[in-house]
């Protein structure tokens, strides 16, 4: 059986990166092994083959040493393990991981596929110009570069990736774990709104809460409640965003309407989907330039469950949320339009049911983890058949197909 190494120059695996795990387990024709730096949540994301390099703090000890060696582009521990395992394909997750392993690609003879996810395109090259130079070398050495959607693909090409090497490979979800359920509520009853994500500026949570406050003013007597799943990661930026969120709750006197559950495992998030009527996800481009890159996987899961999604025309979100069909889209930062659309959804239970049904269809057609696994297998095979980097599977998209 052919071997694919999934390499991530960071910990395997944060609870919010379940979308990466879906890529590991849905290509059964390839044996999967993980290379990483430290581990967490192994009970949630079990994997039979795993090699952790330099586990520990990134500021001292083995973790710091491994980080320094990665920066040279010639980490001897990584080189030794690649020599032992002799993989057919290395699938690097995030741009820096691709660069760190790319120096071994020719001498070890593996195909190198690198997936970009957002921050590695939108922020890293801007904040640290050396990454533009490093990406140039990666684009020369690597075989294929995968992104979630056409918007992200264009950004990758702007960074210098050859267009023929940049492919759209969607992030799928396990449909058997997210069942469809129509939310049939009586008109005039309480409408429950769900937000989910880390407290980062790009998530737009302050805009979401402001929209709720404005909606209550637009339609007196409307009953809205909000559940927030997520929290600050403890960083300075995360704590600042948390204070902005709490400030909006206080400003619009939403204390009695908002429940904050903190971080929750994915199973708890999925359970909460069925207790709510509208998924609110108004992503924005952060002041740092950070953005979603593609689209939040939580939007895909919410749509799969049969819930309409209210979001923004941000990155590749329009590839999931079809305005007026599976939910509504408004411009980034337009809280007035967001509030108006929220009132519209809250006032029309039958429209919510119809949009939820259409959302499920879109997810089944385009975001089934098993189908995306088939596509990923085809990508791997195209790179180990003697024509690495010169041929792609016929069904892999270079740009968005119209619905």
Where are these regions (language model features)?
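Conserved donor-binding/catalytic core segment of Leloir-type glycosyltransferases
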Residues: 6, 146, 184-203, 209-214, ...
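Nucleotide-activated donor-binding/catalytic signature segment of Leloir-type glycosyltransferases, i.e.
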Residues: 239-267
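Short His-centered aromatic/hydrophobic patch
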Residues: 92-97, 116
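Acidic donor-binding loop of glycosyltransferase active sites
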Residues: 274-291, 307
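Short hydrophobic beta-strand element within catalytic cores of glycosyltransferases
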Residues: 299, 304, 308-311, 321
